[in-house]
Amino acid sequence: MKNPPVCCVITRLPEAESLKKSEGAAFYELRLDLLGESWREAAAMLDKPFMATCRRSAEGGSFSGSEEERIGLLEKAAAAGAFMLDIEYSTPHLGEVLKRLRTQSKCLVSHHNFADTPSAGDLKTLVKDMLNYPADIYKVITTATSINDNIKLLNLIKEIPDKKIVAFAMGNLGILSRILCPLAGSPFTYASLNDSNQSASGQMTLAQMIEIYRSVNYENHT
């Protein structure tokens, strides 16, 4: 049965047995900031494409080096085979950074709000501002404080159909948007490899996500 593309997040060196259970993933995300020096070893274990992400502490990650070091690490990941690089919208000199990195890999520009979910109008304005920076995919992640926040993010995807936008909310109240965003038009959604690889609040495991899609017969709704 066809499932929506799911990006499987890896935050620590995986066990071979865990990877065997991840056949439902479309590709992986390697969190370079959390994997540390073991990211190369993790990349060598993968049998599917991977995206590379290196989050600063201000963006919910653990990288504490300079911006040049961080961008350099992403370049190393691209050289090691990363097909896409996640670049935060808050990155200093974003235009120059994207121009530099897009010669080496596809790029995803991301924005994370760890406090709440802005109004629908503010979300649309945010995305329009992000679109000023050429990228392959745009990602807007907020924090749900109400079940209605899921609706805002799902509508955001549908309102800009000519661009590839991933949008959902973190937190237990945002789980619904994590599951449904592909139905609204997101190119993919995220899940953790297992419970020990969770990288954000409300993130489900790959096995849980796949089971839900199978239970609701996802293929017949696309």
Swiss-Prot record:
Gene3D superfamilies: Aldolase class I. One of its GO terms (biological process) is aromatic amino acid family biosynthetic process. It catalyses: 3-dehydroquinate = 3-dehydroshikimate + H2O. GO terms for molecular function: 3-dehydroquinate dehydratase activity. It comes from the Bacteria. The active site is at 112 (proton donor/acceptor), 139 (schiff-base intermediate with substrate). Keywords: Amino-acid biosynthesis, Aromatic amino acid biosynthesis, Lyase, Schiff base. InterPro entries: Aldolase_TIM, DHquinase_I, Type-I_3-dehydroquinase. Its EC number is 4.2.1.10. SUPFAM superfamilies: Aldolase. 3-dehydroquinate binds at residues 29-31, 55, 178, 199, 203. Pathway: Metabolic intermediate biosynthesis; chorismate biosynthesis; chorismate from D-erythrose 4-phosphate and phosphoenolpyruvate: step 3/7. Belongs to the type-I 3-dehydroquinase family. Involved in the third step of the chorismate pathway, which leads to the biosynthesis of aromatic amino acids. Catalyzes the cis-dehydration of 3-dehydroquinate (DHQ) and introduces the first double bond of the aromatic ring to yield 3-dehydroshikimate. NCBIfam families: aroD. PANTHER family: 3-DEHYDROQUINATE DEHYDRATASE. Homodimer. This is 3-dehydroquinate dehydratase. It comes from Dehalococcoides mccartyi (strain ATCC BAA-2266 / KCTC 15142 / 195). The gene is aroD.
